[in-house]
Amino acid sequence: MKTTFLDFEQPIAELEAKIEELRFVQDDSAVDISEEIERLSKKSQQLTKDLYANLSPWQVSQIARHPQRPYTLDYVAELFTDFHELHGDRAFADDLSIVGGLARFGGHPCMVIGHQKGRDTKERAARNFGMPRPEGYRKAERLMRLAEKFGLPIFTFVDTPGAYPGIGAEERGQSEAIGRNLYVMAELKTPIITTVIGEGGSGGALAIAVADTVMMLQFSTYSVISPEGCASILWKSAAKAPEAAEALGLTAHRLKALGLIDKIINEPLGGAHRDPKGMAALLRRALADSLRQFQGMSIDALRERRFERLMAYGKFKETTPGA
């Protein structure tokens, strides 16, 4: 698949286009231009490295939303075996914006749950662009209860702009469904490992992210509101989104510094979408390390650790100027 470049990546796009052109010429020419292709490839790689070393929060937000970025089902295919998807909340409908089911990780049974946005127009509409309705969260709760019953660890993957704010969703109890998931996950008697793989949008993300370990991919985001939404409220203009992204502190490094997440998983050069298999390999190691941490831990110790972790959110320290 041809790589889609973001606006701020245009210098890289131009170099890659030139390299592709030279490769095409070389195939139809007796002249050896392999050295020039290699030189430009190294230049493109260095340019990418320099650009990605100095990304603004707004640019990170754009990468987190990249249309070619791996989604939950892409990681399921790479990381898990024997995946059997489970459908429906047993109350209203099957919300396709949340996928989940039984699987094996490293040969051991587990439960996998995550947001799914969709690749093309038809699938995006069917999956509501990754914005769950109440039935999606209730499906997630049902699967988590099932995992608890059989003592299966739960892996969740977060990638949503937020919970769907439509009238029907509100009528069916959107806030209740989200709130119930927060309550249920805080009390579950099985390990929960969450990874933010793209966008972590507000309560819509948190409803499957109350976990024993929360990790973020290097160029993912996690925030109470989107930069555009924040800008529209504070400045009455979505054009102020770059400033809002800076103020929100939504990047993985910022959240790790604040103690809100446990680990950052580095992405391949240029982002996860440039090397999905490489990203999956890095994620596999991180998930295995996290799961190993909870093996042999008693249920009481696990829940106590989770409670202490949750209660640590919002702690602050008062300082006296000049002290």
UniProtKB/Swiss-Prot annotation:
According to its UniProt entry, the function of this protein is described as: Component of the acetyl coenzyme A carboxylase (ACC) complex. First, biotin carboxylase catalyzes the carboxylation of biotin on its carrier protein (BCCP) and then the CO(2) group is transferred by the carboxyltransferase to acetyl-CoA to form malonyl-CoA.
Q: Does the keyword Ubl conjugation apply?
A: no
The reaction(s) catalysed by this protein are:
N(6)-carboxybiotinyl-L-lysyl-[protein] + acetyl-CoA = N(6)-biotinyl-L-lysyl-[protein] + malonyl-CoA
In Swiss-Prot or TrEMBL terms, this protein is called Acetyl-coenzyme A carboxylase carboxyl transferase subunit alpha
Q: Give the pathway.
A: Lipid metabolism; malonyl-CoA biosynthesis; malonyl-CoA from acetyl-CoA: step 1/1
Give its localization. Cytoplasm
Chief localization: cytoplasm
The UniProt GO MF terms for this protein read: acetyl-CoA carboxylase activity; ATP binding; carboxyl- or carbamoyltransferase activity
Q: What is its EC number?
A: 2.1.3.15
This protein's gene is called: accA
